[in-house]
């Protein structure tokens, strides 16, 4: 969006984790406020109208009607953890939150590089986005403790990773599917 730039592009103005988005990872989007390739966004326009606040929760009018229904459906990333992620970033401090976000991004890149059979990108993105960091660390440790996977075909490696991630999600009753927005009308 013209005139909208931010120094922190990994964690968006509205609280979404751009660092874990497939569009950002693939180089198709620079992240929130990252310059060329950024999509038009009503929330970014609102930020400009309110003095360019770095994050919406720093605006005195937050939460505002712009967020009505915002978390009801997903885009390239799940929206359902957005408010929880904002709370965590404010509680831990942005620097600590961003360090954890970078660790999640590294885990996601590892899954995509070593366990993606060409059909699991959305699943891995969603799982890393929604699962707590400690669960992701456990899954990666379990995968790393299975050297026989290195000798197996991509499909078998992918299935092993999917199984462990799904088990972690099931233990927490987390659905690893993106939610579609209900159609208006």
Where are these regions (language model features)?
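N-terminal cysteine/histidine-rich coordination modules
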Residues: 1-56, 61
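Short loop/turn segments that flank or connect secondary-structure elements
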Residues: 58-163, 172-185
